[in-house]
């Protein structure tokens, strides 16, 4: 499957944190994705861009915090992350660019 331009709209960037690194040891990868992206869209995009087989996709939405900017209250943007579990034998090196 070849990657289409809309696949790059679904997957924004890889998430590199301590928890994401621990997930990679269990054959998983974490991506920041578009808020309106669905699990089937995320699965299709990952399989097309990285040429791997996806076993499961779990998503989480983090609500933006209320913070003060120059003394006035403001709200940070909401974020959606996708925890992608890969089939055995498939790997993704997130240190290389998308």
From Swiss-Prot:
- What are the annotated GO cellular component locations? ribonucleoprotein complex; ribosome
User: Which InterPro entries does the annotation name?
Assistant: Nucleotide-bd_a/b_plait_sf (IPR012677), Ribosomal_uL23-like (IPR013025), Ribosomal_uL23/eL15/eS24_sf (IPR012678)
Q: Which UniProt keywords apply?
A: Ribonucleoprotein, Ribosomal protein, RNA-binding, rRNA-binding
Q: Name the Gene Ontology biological process terms.
A: translation
SUPFAM superfamilies found in the cross-reference section: Ribosomal proteins S24e, L23 and L15e
The answer, when asked if Transport is one of the entry's keywords, is: no
Give the molecular function GO annotations: rRNA binding; structural constituent of ribosome
Signal sequence extent: none
Name any one Pfam family assigned in the record: Ribosomal_L23
Purpose: One of the early assembly proteins it binds 23S rRNA. One of the proteins that surrounds the polypeptide exit tunnel on the outside of the ribosome. Forms the main docking site for trigger factor binding to the ribosome.
Q: Which NCBIfam families match?
A: PRK05738.1-3, PRK05738.1-5, PRK05738.2-4
Relate the assembly described in the record: Part of the 50S ribosomal subunit. Contacts protein L29, and trigger factor when it is bound to the ribosome.
The similarity annotation says:
Belongs to the universal ribosomal protein uL23 family.
This chain belongs to which protein, by name? Large ribosomal subunit protein uL23
Gene name, Swiss-Prot/TrEMBL? rplW
